[in-house]
A protein has these predicted regions:
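Conserved phosphate-binding/catalytic region of the ribokinase-like
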Residues: 8-12, 60-180
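Conserved beta-alpha-beta core of the PfkB/ribokinase-like small-molecule kinase fold
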Residues: 1-71, 91-92
Length: 180
């Protein structure tokens, strides 16, 4: 209820709503309950981010078995969502807008742990959008931030600064996935 109240307040005050699905199985009674509430919140957002697995949970009731990123994005775009970002780990990301699909790449890195990668991605991606960067540049920032985070030993200590992200972009190779 608090989430829906916050979304309503944001809407009334012309504040954009970014919704990160951030599904954690142990916080829900059933996948059906998670699917219902995640989809209700997502369709009220301006921007929705999540992993492919999180989109699968959200779509459990609406589009059972769907694995098609474009279909996952289409129903949200039809509801008025402006940006849909599907994080795919080492396969990059797919971002959908009404203008079409943009494929985000990765900065290959030595993985010490994966936790925190999604938070780094989301925060850097949103930073780029809030600073009026091109979508492709926001995706580079997101990929760099994720790579820095997974290369560190702890989650919070590995969260990069803006300077670290920009240095990483300048000195590392950005790789687009073979199959978009």
């Amino acid at each position: 209820e608090a989430v829906f109240h916050a979304i309503s307040l944001a809407r009334r005050n012309h504040v954009a709503v970014a919704f990160d699905l951030d599904y954690r199985e142990d916080t829900w009674d059933t996948v059906e309950e998670a699917s219902l509430y995640l989809s209700l919140a997502a369709e009220k957002a301006d921007l929705v981010l999540g992993t492919r697995d999180e989109f699968d949970v959200m779509e459990h009731l609406l589009h059972t078995g769907n694995q098609d990123d474009a279909k996952s994005a289409a129903w949200l775009l039809e509801k008025g969502v402006s940006v849909v970002s599907i994080k795919k780990g080492k396969k990059g990301s797919h971002v959908f807008t009404k203008e079409g699909k943009t494929v985000g790449g990765i900065y290959p890195a030595q993985v010490l742990k994966t936790f925190g990668a999604g938070d780094s991605y989301s925060s850097a991606f949103l930073f780029g959008l809030l600073h009026n960067m091109e979508l492709k540049d926001s995706l580079r920032y997101a990929a760099a931030a994720s790579s820095i985070t997974i290369s560190g030993h702890s989650c919070s200590d590995s969260m990069p600064t803006l300077e670290q992200v920009e240095d990483y972009i300048a000195h590392h190779e950005y790789v687009l996935p073979d199959t978009p």
